[in-house]
């Protein structure tokens, strides 16, 4: 239980509940947008790869999107720059994503307008799809959205 406003009204429910559709507020201090969901990451490299496994989860609070995903690359010799789609919210600026993998080398991610682009750790050289052939990626990131 906690108090609200000057009259210290009490909320008796076990949790805060938001409506299914956002009810915008003109007051910037009002939390009026919360959403949790799933999305399926898809190849955005242009190679048309079909991931063996692709699951993604996100939480959006106001204009902040935090996500995690597991992506398993198929066996491929494709040399296009590796990337996959991000959660269903446009980002305002580029942001970094953390990637853990069984790829045998450090990887990093950059969240841009088209998705999550994968780079070798400490470099912005392209990582080819072939470099991730048969590999499992565990990805997490946070970015700002305008919606």
Predicted features along the sequence, with ranges:
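Intrinsic low-complexity, repeat-rich intrinsically disordered segments enriched
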Residues: 1-47, 68, 75, 102-104
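Generic structural hydrophobic/aromatic packing signal, biased to beta-strands
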Residues: 16-18, 31, 39, 58, ...
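A general secondary-structure signal for short beta-strands and their flanking turns/coil
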Residues: 36, 62-64, 134-138
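Extracellular jelly-roll beta-sandwich "head" domains, especially the C-terminal globular C1q domain
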Residues: 50-55, 70-147
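Acidic, contiguous internal or C-terminal segments within carbohydrate-active enzymes
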Residues: 53-63
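Short, well-ordered beta-strand segments enriched in hydrophobic/aromatic residues
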Residues: 63-71
